[in-house]
Regions:
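Structure-specific nucleic-acid interaction/processing domains
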Residues: 1-104
Length: 105
């Protein structure tokens, strides 16, 4: 039996400097090890150690569209300009689906 996809919005907090990252993630396991896509966040996880970061699931949605809409609402222009966030891009991106691709010989 196939597991149900969970469309989530999460927050990762750096426990040392209180910087945060808000992102979206599609998973079948809320306890997976995914820790965001920000290169700035990834750099700090390497520098400070994973033990100094906390991940919280803020919202779980039934659809991708609901998840994307919530991330757009939370990670807006004002949010990305804050000095306490790793987010540098507006929310709502990141999940792009390509159509069918054919390769001819």
């Amino acid at each position: 039996m196939k597991k149900k996809k969970l469309y989530t919005i999460y927050k990762i907090t750096n426990l040392l400097n209180e910087m945060i990252y808000i992102g979206q993630h599609v998973t079948e396991n809320l306890n997976d090890s995914y820790m965001g896509s920000s290169k700035y966040l990834k750099r700090d996880i390497i520098d400070f150690g994973l033990q100094n970061f906390k991940k919280e699931i803020l919202f779980i949605f039934e659809t991708k569209e609901e998840m994307i809409a919530k991330e757009k609402e939370l990670v807006n222009k004002e949010f990305t300009k804050r000095i306490d966030t790793y987010n540098r891009s507006l929310g709502g991106g990141g999940l792009y689906t390509l159509g069918q691709v054919s390769v001819k010989d």
